[in-house]
Design a protein with these regions (language model features):
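Feature captures the FAD/FMN-dependent oxidoreductase FAD-binding
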Residues: 77-143
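Beta1-alpha1 glycine-rich phosphate/pyrophosphate-binding loop at the start
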Residues: 9-13, 18-102, 204-205, 292-298
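Short beta-strand to alpha-helix junction loop
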Residues: 72-91, 103, 274-282, 307-319
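Rossmann-like dinucleotide-binding core of oxidoreductases
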Residues: 5-8, 13-18, 22-37, 41-43, ...
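Core beta-strand elements of the Rossmann-like FAD/NAD(P) dinucleotide-binding domain
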Residues: 7-9, 125-134, 172-173, 347-356
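A conserved short coil-to-beta-strand element within the FAD-binding core of flavoproteins
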Residues: 104-119, 329-347
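Glycine/threonine-rich phosphate-binding loop and adjacent beta-strand/alpha-helix elements that clamp
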Residues: 356, 360-369
Length: 369
């Protein structure tokens, strides 16, 4: 047994992802608390280490999706990709001297409070038990695949995997690929693999509200200012903070200054679409994107949700609709009835022969351990 497991810590932190690292930094600043981070993987990063599917990136601007106490002047673009976020988290772990407080390859099975000892007891798969006076859970929700309940899913004889467990060893070239799901994960990887497969069928249960993504690469002058001009990086980060808060207040708080300001600012768009509330601004942006990127009117109808924008996650992207328009890509909106050895059967009576199934069906967000 690890000798450290006999020690009683002030705080045990579960997970060395963004939440765990942020908690550790604040405990280090306090300097009066002994703590240990228990991380199941071999490195930090949490979801940004475990998820590696093509096209994975953050839909929050990079200078806002980072710690205020560890501003990064070297982000290469507005919306960073997975590897860049993981590099950032690895770097700050060392820069802030957090790594010595992390026990890697330590999968937590349970944490329970011992009322008799007035301590938390955290049990690992290895059999070790760590005790602490306080417990901080930094366990994320975006790492356990959610598999659809489709009859015959286990009978498929071809290759299959979930986007959360991307099989990089499998060559998709010249394969007939079925993608089940069209949420954020699928919308991320579909454009990246569409050109390499011989045929792709995207099975869509319901469309999502998709809006334009204002993404660009930072030029050398901008990065110079972010690194060397006093307070510029903090001001730029606050700029993104303000935009996010403005959108929240305007979207969820009706008839306030922010919502009225934005409605006036894009009155031309609102008039065109006969929409008069702030959340309709996003809908207008989505409809404009569809108009610009899709020519077939009947195809457009399949991509417009029948529910109000904001009921589900709004997805920013510029390359999903063009991917669906490729000659080797088709969108299937008939519901899946069952899966057989080499086919997907839809409820309209058709059969689709395929070589591989990629499940882009998201995560089981109700399971933490």
């Amino acid at each position: 047994m690890d000798s450290n497991s006999k020690k009683i810590y002030d705080v045990i932190i579960l997970g060395a992802g963004i939440s765990g690292l942020g908690s550790a930094y604040n405990l280090l600043r306090n300097k009066n608390s002994s703590f240990l981070i228990l991380e199941k993987n071999e490195g930090v990063g949490g979801t940004w280490r475990e998820n590696t599917y093509p096209g994975l990136c953050c839909d929050v601007p990079s200078h806002f999706y980072s710690f205020s106490f560890a501003i990064n002047p070297d982000w290469t673009k507005t919306y960073p990709e997975q590897y860049e976020i993981l590099d950032y988290l690895e770097n700050i772990t060392d820069k802030l001297k957090i790594r010595p407080f992390i026990k890697f390859n330590s999968e937590v099975l349970e944490s329970k409070f011992n009322e008799k000892e007035n301590l938390w007891e955290t049990s690992l798969r290895s059999g070790e038990i760590y005790k602490s006076r306080s417990l901080i859970s930094g366990l994320g929700q975006l790492n356990k695949p959610k598999w659809p309940e489709i009859p015959g899913i286990e009978t498929f004889s071809g290759h299959s995997f979930h986007s959360a467990e991307w099989d990089h060893s499998y060559d998709l070239a010249n394969k007939r690929v079925a993608v089940i799901g069209n949420g954020p994960s699928a919308i991320g990887f579909i454009p990246k693999i569409a050109d390499s497969v011989s045929k792709m069928i995207v099975f869509q249960r319901s469309p999502n509200w998709i809006v334009p993504k204002d993404d660009r690469i930072y030029n050398s002058f901008e990065r110079f200012c972010l690194r060397y001009v006093p307070f510029y990086a903090k001001m730029y980060r606050f700029y993104w903070f303000f935009l996010q808060e403005r959108n929240y207040l305007a979207f969820y708080q009706k008839h306030n200054f922010f919502s009225k300001f934005v409605e006036r600012a894009i009155s031309a768009v609102l008039t065109k679409f006969k929409l008069f509330e702030f959340e309709k601004v996003y809908a207008a942006g989505s409809l404009m994107l569809i108009d610009e990127q899709i020519q077939d009117e009947s195809f457009k109808d399949k991509l417009i949700p029948d529910y109000p924008i904001g009921c589900k996650r709004i997805i920013p992207t510029n390359d999903y609709f063009p991917a669906l328009c490729k000659d080797n890509v088709s969108l299937e909106t008939s519901l899946i009835e069952k899966i057989s050895s080499n086919k997907i059967h839809t409820k309209d009576g058709r059969e689709h022969e395929i070589d591989v199934i990629i499940y882009g069906t998201g995560f089981d967000t109700n399971i933490f351990i």
